[in-house]
Amino acid sequence: MNFKKPATLVLVSLTSTGGWAQLSSPPNAPVQDMGRVEIKSNRDNDTEERRQSTAAKIVIGREELDRQGDGTLGEVLKRLPGVTIQGAPGRGGAIRMRGLGGGYTQILMDGQRVPPGFSIDSLTPEMIEKVEILRAPTAETGARAIAGTINIVLREGLRANPDDLKVGSSFENGHRSEGLNWVHNIKSEALIGTFTVSAMNMWRPEDNNTLTDTEVDALGKLPAGSSHRERHTENLGHRQGLNANARLMWRGEEGKTLVLMPFMVYSEFNSLGHIDLTESKTVGGQSQSFSSDSAQTSNNSRFVMTRLNGQWNQRFSADTRFEFKFGLGESHYSYKFNQTELGTSGLLNTMTEAQAFKDLSQSWNGKLTQVLQNGHQVVSGLELEGVRRTEEAVADVMDDAGNMRARTQRWAVYTQDEWSINPHWNAHAGIRYENILTEGVTSEGAKRNQSAVLSPLLHAVWKPQPDSKDQVRMSLTRSYKTPTLVNLVALTSLSREANSPTRPDRTGNPGLKPELATGIDVAVERYLTEGGVLSANVFRRNISDLIRYVTSERYDTAWAPGQRRFVSSPQNVGNAITQGLELEAKFRMDQVWTTVPAIDIRSNLSFFHSRVLDVLGPNNRLDQQPSMTANLGGDYRIRSMPLTLGGNVNFNPDYTTRRSNEQWAYQGAKRVVDVYGLWKFNPATALRVTVSNLVPRDYLTGTTYIGNGFSETANTNTRNWQNVQVRLEMKI
């Protein structure tokens, strides 16, 4: 990949703002009286934790989490370096690091993998103490993190803090939603703890328009001709949710502590919608038919999850500590979709789909930490995890979708050592072995998959001077991505409308192998004297046995033997390479120019490039990885009044992905502007106004299939709207 042009542009921009050298004080610079006293904030502690870590880590604490008044954690993460959100602007979606999601990005909660079915959008910033982002895996956090790891640390109890209460309403396209967040701190002598409750009553409109064009030439298996379909869908969804978690810590004698962390999520969603569909066909160059149809739809779903995490710490001596963690969880999900045809053409069938699953999960982790006399800190651990799923599904499209029983068992053992080689060098080396077994039984028979991976991992930090604020990080790692339960043993899902390359049936593949990646990361960091950081990071991952959904034309399916069906299933398609450049700058403007206002600047710029070697180019990139992502944000406190103003601009360009020699996918550009104002009436009461997606733009996506004398393109336009939130924030 050629990074010269982007890198040059960034260097020019840094130079124009005074450069790195200007942002730090010269060693012998005289002390100037600035006329005010600077007080260190929690943000400085987050920056210091980042600087002291041997493995590359970004820490986002309470100050950053609260800054913009975001409604979900995903809205906070989208502004971080290299992080993108899948889907339309303002609609949430899967979190992706370096443009990679779907198993490439590992999500942890309090250091443990999140339970099945958990959505990061179910967490509000008020429920979280801090977020740690690791760009390279470690033996302790796990190697299933080709793109990186996001560790969410839930709220911790602090004796001195009063309760927090936040009540607000938001408005989107004429629909009002409400939300409440309450944080209660326990202040007893024997117990330190926090209870957090978040409730929502949200209305969300949706408006999609899909145009599908199909052509069959003389070489196809159908008569030469073409068709044009236009599908317009409108929905109004209503979501009600209640999330609660607690962190309770008892301190015993001689370094003994017990922490219990119960967690509960309840979410119910209902929507009513309307579909209008028209289709025109041409055969032999002459109009053959024109049809139209419409339907009413209803969608009802419910998700309930309860989980108890626990942690026991036992300090045997000043240098030896044992930690035991456990997690027990249960989740239930039910879903029902009804479609009622209003016309008579048969383009939209009257149908019902229903699905329900139950997951039972448990995890048991033990870790021993020893500080040796020669300065080495050795951590060794054993992990056990099990998940059982029972699923029932019914669909009227063809036959019953059937039932499924599946289980996943995982165990891992690891050891790592962190030490200081000399005042200039720190190192962190580890090795991890992990074994995963997945078994399932469906109406299509029994399926089984087992994989084992050994991952050596090495990190190092070099400082030009022992007390230097400049440092260079290096990582050489082995990471991997395992097939998901859905990839391996999923029930066959049939297309609701006429089967085609852009509306295929979907099924699993029990023969998948895990993706393996060898990676290297190199970063240069400068920590500024008065707070802030400048960093540049380059990375590369060489991936083997890449997993990708591929659509094929089949006549031998078990559910429609002898019929022509387009089927999408996951396959190991070969090898891939991904690499990138990540730049970050966080500073206060008066650190550069003393005469300008003290505006806090947060900016990052990332460039990505990838190639799937067994797919012809151009655009043979990894799925849904943009070529770049950028954020520019700022905050300013007006000193003459109790008002703080701020905002952020997020940008992802449009791009095309060639998924196979016959398939292409298009993702439109995303430009999201968020602004806010915070008025403090007194230290305990404030009013916040936030405008998300200030300048809404339609979001475009598309898919194309060309092969065997058959071509089809489907383009979807998704509308989105400005969201205005008004929230009262109180400390009680």
Residue ranges with predicted function:
Residues 74-112:
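Extracytoplasmic beta-strand/coil segments of soluble accessory domains associated
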Residues 245-267, 296-447, 462-463, 467, ...:
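Face-selective signature of the C-terminal outer-membrane beta-barrel domain
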Residues 36-68, 93-94, 102-105, 158:
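N-terminal periplasmic "start-of-domain" segments of outer-membrane beta-barrel proteins
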Residues 427, 535, 539-542, 560-655, ...:
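Gram-negative outer-membrane beta-barrel transporters
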Residues 85, 96, 112-138, 182:
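Short acidic/polar hinge/loop motifs at secondary-structure boundaries
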Residues 73-76, 93-96, 133, 145-167, ...:
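N-terminal periplasmic accessory domains that precede
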Residues 301-305, 357, 406-408, 478-543, ...:
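Outer-membrane beta-barrel signature, preferentially recognizing the C-terminal barrel domain
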Residues 651-658, 678-732:
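C-terminal beta-signal and adjacent terminal beta-strands/loops
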